[in-house]
Every structure is written in C-alpha cells, then in structure tokens.
Amino acid sequence: MAEEQEFTQLCKLPAQPSHPHCVNNTYRSAQHSQALLRGLLALRDSGILFDVVLVVEGRHIEAHRILLAASCDYFRGMFAGGLKEMEQEEVLIHGVSYNAMCQILHFIYTSELELSLSNVQETLVAACQLQIPEIIHFCCDFLMSWVDEENILDVYRLAELFDLSRLTEQLDTYILKNFVAFSRTDKYRQLPLEKVYSLLSSNRLEVSCETEVYEGALLYHYSLEQVQADQISLHEPPKLLETVRFPLMEAEVLQRLHDKLDPSPLRDTVASALMYHRNESLQPSLQSPQTELRSDFQCVVGFGGIHSTPSTVLSDQAKYLNPLLGEWKHFTASLAPRMSNQGIAVLNNFVYLIGGDNNVQGFRAESRCWRYDPRHNRWFQIQSLQQEHADLSVCVVGRYIYAVAGRDYHNDLNAVERYDPATNSWAYVAPLKREVYAHAGATLEGKMYITCGRRGEDYLKETHCYDPGSNTWHTLADGPVRRAWHGMATLLNKLYVIGGSNNDAGYRRDVHQVACYSCTSGQWSSVCPLPAGHGEPGIAVLDNRIYVLGGRSHNRGSRTGYVHIYDVEKDCWEEGPQLDNSISGLAACVLTLPRSLLLEPPRGTPDRSQADPDFASEVMSVSDWEEFDNSSED
C-alpha cells in the first residue's frame, strides 16, 4: 500500500495547467489504418471470426460481416439496414461473377486491385452492382489506358450501359485530344451524330486551326479522298457545319470557299465571316459564340516593358506563363508596339495597350494605342488618344475603356478619356479634380478607383472613385502610405494596392506595405507585405491570386525578374516562376490563349540587332542604374 501511495504521489499532475500554452493534444497514427487492414487480412487468412458466407454462382466465400458493411453502401444496407440478410448465415449475391466477387473482397481486405483485360469488365459490372466508387474509377482508368481507335466505340457502349459519366468524359477527352487523326477513321463516322456535334462544339477541341474543324465536319459524311478532291455537295450543308467557327478561319481560306459556293445559307455564313475580317476595327463589338477561341487556357500575359541586358532594350515581345509547363514562354506577332508602362485593358479577350512611354532617347509620352487579337495572333493600331498620356492608369468599366490622367513630360494631367470599341473613338469625360501621374487604377462593382501617385514632386496617398452613371469623381479615404509607380488589383470585392516607391525616408525607397480597401466599410487595412520591392510592376489576377511581375527595386538599385503571387485566403506571398530577364514597365493581364500557341515547341528569341535595322538605335550602352534615367519612374 505504501508503495502504491508513493507511486501515486510521484505521478501526480496538476488539475489545472499553469502554463498558458499547455492544452489537450490529439495524436493520430499514420500507420493505424494499414495495420488494421493487415490484422483483418490475417484473420481472413487464418479463417478466424467469420460470421457470414456469400454464395456467388453456387460457390461459398466466407467473410466478416462488419467489414463488408463498412466497405460500401450495398453491404451496409444489407447487414445494417434491417433486411433479412442481417440474420442469415448464408447470403445469396446476384448479378456478380464468382471471380469478380473474389477480386472485390481482396480489395476490401487489402486496398489492392489487380486488373487485366480478361477481368476488367466483370469487375466493373460487380463494382457497379455493389456500389463501390473506388473500384469503378480504377476500372475506368484501366480501360482508358487501353483505349484506341478500334475499341473506343465498345468502351462508349460500356459507359452508356452503366451510366458511367466519368468514363464518358474521359472518352470525349481522348477524341478531343486526337481529333484530327480520329476524324480520318471509319470509327469516327460510327459515332452518333449528336455526340460528334457536341465534340465539334467544344472549346477543348484540339486543332491547329479552324479549317481542321471544317474538314472534320465534312469527314463525318464524306471520305478523306472525297474531301481532298472537293467531291462534296454544300448546297444543303451538313448540320455539323453549324459547329464551325468560320470567323476564326483565315480570310484567304474563307474567300476561296466563298468563291466556289453557289447561293446558299452556307455561302451567307461564309460571307458574314469575311465581313468580320474586313471590319477589323469593329471586331470587339462583333463577338459571338462563333468568334470564341477553342481554348480554356487562361494565362498571365505580359507585354512590352524595358529590360536590363548588357544594353537597355524596349521590348516588343509578349511573354506568358504556360500553365502546362509552369514557366514563362515568349510569343511574337507582327506590328507589335515596342514601349513600356502602357496602360492595359482586356475586353472580349482582346488586349488594348494605351499610351505609355517610348523612352529611348529621352522622355517621350505616347498617344498611340494598339489592340491584340489572340484568335489570329495579330496587332492592330486603333484610334490614338486625343493627347499624350504617360504614367497613366487604364480601366474597363462596362463596354468602355478609360484612360486616366498621367503626364506628357511637360505637364501633369487630369484629363480622362473614354474609348468606345464600337466606334473606334475617344471622347473626354469628367476630369479629375487635380492632376496626378504614376497612380494605379482598378474597377469594382461598375466603378473605377485610382490610388496614390505623384503630383509634381509630391507622393500621394489619395483615393478617388469615378461613377460612369453620373460622370462624376468622388474623393475617398486616404490610403495608409504614400506611393507611386505601384499596381492595383481587384479580388473578392476588395481593392489591393501593391508595390511602388516613395521618398518618406528622405530618399527613394521601395514600399513593401500592401493596402486593402473595402468598399463596404470605406476603410483601408494592411495585409501581408511584399517580400521584395516591385516598382512599375505588371499586375494580373488569376484563380483568386494576384501576380506581381518584375519591376524595379530602389533598395536593390536594379530591375528584377521576380514574380510574387499573393494568396488572399492564406494572406501570404509565394514565389512564382521567375521571368527570364529583369524587366520593368510590363503591361500585364489575364488572357485566353489558343492551344496551338501553348502546345507548339519553344522557339529561340531572334537576335533583332541583326535582323532589324531600327533596332540598333534603340540600344543604349549604359550601366544598369544609369539606365533608370530613361525609365518612366524618375
């Protein structure tokens, strides 16, 4: 008894924890579930504690009732749902083969399933009967690993028989990815017309050009030889031609098709597509499902900028973050502008670059504007601004694009211009009450907000809101810190102000503080600060994450290729794939790009100093810090 009392005293713990961090802990074993399965398998192998016999095709299989009930809804309903099988020692199983039942029981006891071409169908039938989703998924994945042009129709029939929507989607994806080759097979013409119509209507259809869709629609009704020899009748066009997006075809191809067609509904459709090409300035206002890109790849894209190499170069290249590779790639298009710090807007998946800087030999503000069409990878120069705007902000509100304030390197501006894509024209709207440049803008709930910037040599922390309905500006609460040459983004009904610099310390320093504005409360707050300086950054929002691209750091005294991504749910920054060079003044956005661009092999960047005689005049041999003199950020 004395020993017992002594032990109790030695082990006595306080009734209440005195340490503030002392709390109850829960421990979880990562090995417990597998150990439990091994124990149950050992019981099965030893023939211990069996309490039910399954009778399948006249053969007996012993099992543990509680494990079966825990494994799937079918057995749970049988053994725990008040049915007569609860009391039976032997239970008859219908609609399942003996071999498949053995396979499924092995999976229940081990979590392992061995599939082959000889057993997959009967295993799938049994899994559907017994309602075991995991085994159904395994069988579907196994079938997909063996799908080819010869057996795909059989697998489609299997998916339809058991209502396997996931398998049907996988088969659809197989055809969408291999459409050009599959459309030249006999099996293609054996698919139901409704199925082919659905596939040809999909944005996920992988083709290099819309002409391949046109040919695929014809190949459902004609042989390849007939299509190639033009031995087809289009007076009453096949229904599948309704899925062809004729405006996405090249104008030359459309013209040849139009010239050989007799008067018919199809000829009228082709004529409308030709008119779309001829009215290039009005294309953004002529958008319809017929002009939608066949792609679901939304990418962060950056245009222009000025980058640091052995010399300082204004870029006319675009770069995009390839979602398949997780790295930055370049693409080029003819007549691309070569500038930096341009205002950027996206409307109907067209990119607009507005004004900006052409600071090659001194400071020069721009009034010229461009539009990029990813459907045809072409640039088009639209109507110029009515005056030059550098260090401006650009926003889309409704169907209009607004260019707000800035400077022309002689005067600071308060002018606001509005662009109407339907008329390709600019018009002045209500100006700001005072001049501002190097500010940033964003749109939220049909209104336009601009923040901070500079006026003369002074850094600002002002916030202004434009209401297009009343054509008026309103002043809101000041932000928490002065800054200029920063970026703004709208995310989850809040405005974020990111990056930039100020001289509050008596000299130019990066601003790491990130400010968040709530339109509901009208108040500013601070969130997780930037891990590095980003002045003149590119800003884009994709999948509820803010991308901050490149820029320049006054703390480091250089441009940067860093990419930082803000996760609003976790309130933290993470590093993204770094840009391939240090660049500032990048105009960034999110754009749907064609699959052909993302899937084509990477190409090297040509040496334009050899290919372009004008290129040499745009190169300056100065140090990395000295070339900041020609940056927008003075």
UniProtKB/Swiss-Prot annotation:
Molecular-function GO term, any one: 14-3-3 protein binding
Residue list for modification N-acetylalanine: 2
Start and end residues of each stretch annotated as Disordered: 600-634
Superkingdom, natural source: Eukaryota
Annotated Gene3D superfamilies: 1.25.40.420, Kelch-type beta propeller, Potassium Channel Kv1.1, Chain A
PROSITE patterns assigned to the protein according to its UniProt record, in alphabetical order: BTB
Keyword Nucleus attached: yes
GO terms for biological process, alphabetical: cell division; cellular response to amino acid stimulus; cellular response to L-leucine; mitotic sister chromatid segregation; mitotic spindle assembly checkpoint signaling; negative regulation of autophagy; negative regulation of type I interferon production; positive regulation of cell growth
Residues annotated as domain BTB: 50-117
CDD domains: BACK_KLHL22 (cd18461), BTB_POZ_KLHL22 (cd18251)
Pfam families with a match to the protein in the record: BACK, BTB, Kelch_1, Kelch_KLHDC2_KLHL20_DRC7
Consequence of substituting residue 20 to Q: Found in a patient with isolated coloboma; uncertain significance
Residues carrying Phosphothreonine: 463, 475, 605
PANTHER family per UniProt: KELCH-LIKE PROTEIN 22, LD33804P
Oligomer and partners: Component of the BCR(KLHL22) E3 ubiquitin ligase complex, at least composed of CUL3, KLHL22 and RBX1. Interacts with PLK1. Interacts with DEPDC5 (via DEP domain); the interaction depends on amino acid availability. Interacts with YWHAE; required for the nuclear localization of KLHL22 upon amino acid starvation.
Function: Substrate-specific adapter of a BCR (BTB-CUL3-RBX1) E3 ubiquitin ligase complex required for chromosome alignment and localization of PLK1 at kinetochores. The BCR(KLHL22) ubiquitin ligase complex mediates monoubiquitination of PLK1, leading to PLK1 dissociation from phosphoreceptor proteins and subsequent removal from kinetochores, allowing silencing of the spindle assembly checkpoint (SAC) and chromosome segregation. Monoubiquitination of PLK1 does not lead to PLK1 degradation.
Further facts: Potential oncogene that is up-regulated in breast cancer cells and promotes tumor growth.
Name of this protein: Kelch-like protein 22
Source species: Homo sapiens
The encoding gene: KLHL22
